[in-house]
Amino acid sequence: MKILLASSEVFPFSKTGGLADMVGALGRALVNAGEEAAIVTPLYRGIQNRFPALRRVDWHFDLPLGAQTVPAELWELARPGEAKIYFIDHPGYFDRAGIYQENHLSYADNGERFIFFSKCVVNLARYLPWRPEVVHLHDWQAALVPALILQQKRAGWGNAPATCLTIHNLAYQGVFPEEAFALTNLPADFYAPDGVGTEYFGMLNCLKGGIVFADSITTVSPRYAREITTEELGCGLDGVLRQNHAKLTGILNGVDYAEWNTTKNPYLFKTYSHARMAGKAVNKAELQRLVGLPVDEKIPLFGTISRLAEQKGVDIQLGALEEMLNTNIQFVQLGSGSPEYEKGYRELAARFPGKVAVQFGYNEALSHRIEAGCDFFLMPSRFEPCGLNQMYSLRYGTIPIVRATGGLDDSVIDFNENPAKANGVKFYEYTSRALAKAIRKSIAIYEHPDLIRHFRKTAMKADFSWNQTVAEYIHVYQKILS
């Protein structure tokens, strides 16, 4: 099978979150499974400098974007054992300091940028000598591709590919003023309301268009697939998703264990495994030293790596830490986002010197060191489509403390569910009090050496490799092709 993945970000070229990790790993997993896979993504600032092997393709296209015609160039990168990467080059849209925003402000032309990207994806799928049988779109930035392909099928594209849309986070839908629809050059009937077009309360909703027009819809965990059809977590699209539930599948993301590996990892201070755990204590001591916390094996170290957004449960985490930092624990945080939440963490660090270390931004090396050096990892999300950090934590023997929602509930086993297979701590109510109770439970686990060893070994044996995940995606592709 020939599969083209389209995503606004792909690791290691561009990344703001788990979307990039998933798409890069899925491309590799498809190649390893014997499929022909390629990925298309924008050429953002700095990629050419970091990857000098990029090659310009003798391919130029001029695409209609409303009343104007916009040019694009194409670059490619081939790497052994990996999906080929195609890069859409338009400096006016993609040569910027950020991918979606600068200084916490979204780019005003994001609708135009990613409508253009979607048109480039369709052009690539139709006219490259390598013709995909399936085009797999990721999130709102590529979600108009199924509608654009259907438009060209109506105009005579006889061997058009089937389409699959993966929703990584339903909260991000790509909603723009009605005038943005003109940029798509789609017929007026594609803007139809009532669940049969791209219209959403008088606005263009890119993700809704993908849900309506894609041949198949997947999301990144079985529980999240159920949750998004409810009014509580459907983000206003639950009705449309219920109408299209027959083509909706939940597939838990896999983990790239070549990247997230405790036995061979350049970022770790010392490697270790579930059979030889001594290296974990070394990583804890070196992490404490690195972030400026007192080096003390007896103090449980809690960590988090997260976008600072309400979805991630930052509000209840700050509330719980206010209480729990009065006990004998340490906390390290990495991430960026809401200025209000950044301020909250700075104030926490000022009030609890020697107990709290905060760093803003993203640092790949530090993220591995936090996963390896912490005893517990906090993920108190309000909702979580899949989540990857809890799976990274499990592989690193760092016990995840999670709210039982979405993929967190699918991947973590609490002691009360199955003592023999317990690998984490769950709580259910979205409150600071419930999270604080889970932290106290974790401290009690830490105080019993045999119990913490059991949790760590069970956690490290959990298997979320891509083998099962990619098989489920291939089944979806085969189903829509048949």
Give each language-model segment a name.
Residues 1-482:
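Catalytic cores of nucleotide-sugar-dependent glycosyltransferases that transfer UDP/GDP/TDP-activated
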